[in-house]
Design a protein with these regions (language model features):
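Surface-exposed repetitive/solenoidal architectures
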Residues: 2-359
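Catalytic nucleophile serine of serine hydrolases
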Residues: 371
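Residues that mark the start of a beta-strand
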Residues: 362-364
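Conserved SGNH/GDSL esterase-like catalytic core that processes O-acyl groups on lipids
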Residues: 375-441
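Conserved beta-strand elements of the Class I
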Residues: 366-368
Length: 441
């Protein structure tokens, strides 16, 4: 039985214009919290511009929400033509995807030559007359990407692999955005492609990332030296794009000298605020950094934390970079003639995030609530850090839209919260899953 996606359609993006043919899904699908089990999806498309996933293409105004894929599901991309593939949806066009978690492993075995194929939870997102919303979409599944025909392109025609979205962009005459918020990738990545990231492989145009976190480690073996452009949040940031409150905790290792950054490979002229890297970045390329790999544009970095480490891969015997205080901006990444603007950067080189183990706390605070609570407590770690208060441990159990009776009734059994923790002395929150309120209390 060959399964057809819901909303079967094909697409073409040319000169920043999108054309869709077929019958995209235009409705509202609410999974009501149900879990999809044992669904094995294989995208073996030979048709140029095919879209594949549980949903193929979402039409403007469509909404899909509130369901999950269990570990018995899987997603394999074996396309032989340029296509867009996502566990949830292949193409999201002026539509909304929210409150979805996948634990399905993803496997890329595509081979189409020098053309773009995407694989993520959402293959491609395109905004024209309305914003695209991708909110609270999370990946727990491992990601494996082969490179069967040696496509070594680290640019637009490379194979785009990511935890959340493969390729995001907008219409060339529009200022509508692709908004990706509160998304987490826990999936470790083993990839041989030139564009691979934890959250978005290519934030091409007018993409806004907010409060997204990558915990997945990436090992990349792109088969050509200096071909890959790798970042653990996004590989590149295009015109009109921004990143707010995003953090990377995953290590990024290139064995073949790809350009690597903990946050992004190429920052462009994007704005970054309250972002942080705590991962270890290893590549033999001179274009490496805890923030970006190489950039020759005036990006804006404000109130960001430079943690983790950076150095050479050196045949798996790492040699870490070391700079004097006056030169510590070199940890961030290589710059061309156009220099990025750096404001209030906290250098914590060697810090993998999370502060101490929490045993020295003299005060412990537990917050339970939704997005209003999250907004209220978001900056408390930085405030306490600035005040020199390092004896407070804070935990926030977050679930959007949950009512007070639901928190109470599921006190010891419900574990679908996002657990944000700030250990004593830490400057930010660390996210985890699968904990109950009783466990953290």
């Amino acid at each position: 039985y060959k399964r057809q996606p819901i909303g079967k359609a094909t697409f073409v993006i040319a000169n920043n214009k999108l054309t869709v043919s077929g019958t995209p899904f235009a409705g509202h699908f609410n999974g009501q919290g149900y879990r999809i089990r044992n669904l094995k999806m294989v995208a073996a498309n030979s048709e140029e511009g095919a879209t594949y996933g549980l949903f193929g293409t979402l039409a403007p105004g469509a909404v899909i929400e509130n369901f999950s894929f269990d570990t018995g599901c899987s997603f394999t991309v074996a396309s032989t033509a340029g296509s867009s593939n996502g566990v949830v949806a292949g193409l999201v066009y002026d539509a909304t995807v929210r409150d979805i978690t996948s634990s399905a492993p993803m496997l890329f075995q595509g081979a189409a030559g020098n053309v773009r194929i995407t694989m993520a939870l959402i293959g491609t997102a395109f905004a024209e007359t309305a914003n695209v919303t991708i909110d609270n979409v999370n990946n727990n599944g491992t990601i494996t990407a082969e490179n069967r025909d040696n496509n070594t392109n680290g640019g637009a025609t490379g194979y785009h692999i990511a935890g959340i979205a493969g390729f995001t962009t907008n219409d060339g005459a529009s200022q509508q955005k692709v908004i990706i918020s509160d998304c987490i990738n826990y999936g470790d990545i083993t990839s041989a492609t030139g564009r691979t990231a934890g959250i978005v492989a290519a934030a091409n145009r007018y993409t806004q990332l907010a409060n997204c976190v990558n915990h997945g480690k990436q090992l990349n073996t792109c088969p050509k030296n200096d071909a890959g452009r790798l970042g653990n949040i996004a590989c590149n940031m295009g015109a009109g794009s921004s990143m707010i409150g995003c953090s990377n905790y995953g290590d990024l290792t290139s064995t073949t000298g790809s350009r690597c950054g903990g946050i992004t490979s190429a920052a462009g002229d994007a704005t970054f605020e309250n972002c942080a890297n705590y991962g270890t970045i290893l590549t033999d390329s001179p274009y490496r950094g805890v923030f970006w790999g190489y950039n020759n544009a005036v990006a804006q970095w404000t109130d960001c934390t430079a943690g983790g480490k950076v150095g050479t891969y050196n045949a798996n015997a790492p040699v870490f970079d070391s700079y004097a205080d006056a030169e510590q901006a070199n940890y961030l990444g290589k710059q061309g003639a156009n220099q990025s603007a750096l404001t209030n950067i906290a250098y914590q080189i060697g810090n993998s995030g999370g502060g101490s183990a929490g045993g020295d706390a003299e005060l412990r605070i537990l917050f339970i609530g939704n997005s209003f609570t999250k907004d209220a407590v978001e900056h408390l770690p930085g405030i306490l850090k600035a005040m020199g208060i390092d004896k407070v441990k804070m935990t926030h159990m977050y679930y959007g839209g949950r009512t007070v009776p639901e928190y109470n009734n599921g006190f010891a059994t419900v574990n679908d919260y996002r657990c944000y923790e700030c250990n004593p002395g830490a400057a930010g929150w660390t996210e985890s899953m699968n904990k109950t309120i009783k466990e953290v209390a």
